[in-house]
Amino acid sequence: MVKRNGVFLGTKAGAMVAWLALSMPTVSLAVPPTVTGSLDNRYSDNVTQSAVDEVSDTESRINLSIDHQTDPGRCMASTNAQVGYGTWWDEAYDPELYADAAFFGDCEIRQGLNWELMDSLNQVLQNSRGTDTPDNRTLKNILRTGPRYTMFLGQRDQLSLSAQYQNTEFREPEETDSQRYIGSAAWNHIFDPTLSGGISVSMDRAELDTGGEIDTDVASLNWQKNWAVTQLSASIGYSKLTSRFGSFEQSSDGLVGQVALMRDVTGSLRFFLNASRELTDQTSDFDVRFGEFTFNLRQTSEVEVTALDVGADKSFSSGETLRLVFFANRADYLRVSQKEDSVGIDTVYTRPLGPLWNFDASVRYEYANYDEASENDNTLSVDTRATYSLTRDLSLSGRVGHNRRESDRLANEYEESWVSLGVSYQFR
């Protein structure tokens, strides 16, 4: 029987969120939040995703989700959160807490001066080379807050200053937590109604609970361009990262940049591209901004990261939708000069089967290379679901899926088939 010990996130971040939320002016709650509860039972013939000694078990999970956005006003806030608690019938694992939540709040203190509060809580893997099972997962909470001041220098120029505090905590005590202080300044010039650009500088000072420190400085050129059906924003710059652990000190530098492109090809087809290259550490929010990217928490903290997402969204007159995403990621762990690369494709298809029935399916393939051990992994996941609406608020669902991994290392291979039945209710 597989067991794991862990404690939930510390109270520092939660206490600060509560204090700041109470300190902000009241936000408008004219539109009530959407709250949904569900109960799912999932049977798997290989819950540990093992190459040998496969274990079958059924997990019962209670889920609660909330989605809310306030009306525009002096203070605005948006919340999207899903929380679940699962237990295993044959105790293959200890009871598990699941979470995927994001909160953003912005209050105008006075003209030009705003206070921002952001918090994200996500399930992440501890070892990127491991399997997506409870004994290889942890919760990562990132709280960021601070003031932002914007000043207009004439009709075409704008100066923005910000100072932020960020706290990152993991559920497992063996993972590295951090506190960081981020200061930034940016100047932007409007060249014409469709083109603007400028320069920005930022200083990031991270203090790790292991006693280490990581300083990251960035200077960039930024620009934004809009066409009739296309929006482009990009930056290119120079970054220097310095890490200190006791008497050890190491510096790395290089070119960094970001690109975000969106184009409405037709009224029913949209193309998008997002790419970024940064010098950062594992307690940053890079894996939140690029969901296909995974930090390896078993490696050293300092890392040069590169991520690319290219895809398209297509809708059909019959109500069908198709989303296709190609992704490529690289993590270069600087202190040990080890690289992890991954490329893959993720496809999601949805189709209404009638006034009460809906069907969706997803297929994900990923190829991963680990240069340290000269190993390659190929992972394929298939997930299909049918949903039946009993009433406007009550629905039933059934899912069938299959996961498979082939690897140069036989111990990393596995094959899993699973089936799930669930019921959900939307409270009003």
Q: Which residues make up each language-model segment?
A:
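Gram-negative and organellar
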Residues: L29-R428
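Cleavable N-terminal export/targeting peptides
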Residues: M1-T34, Q426-R428
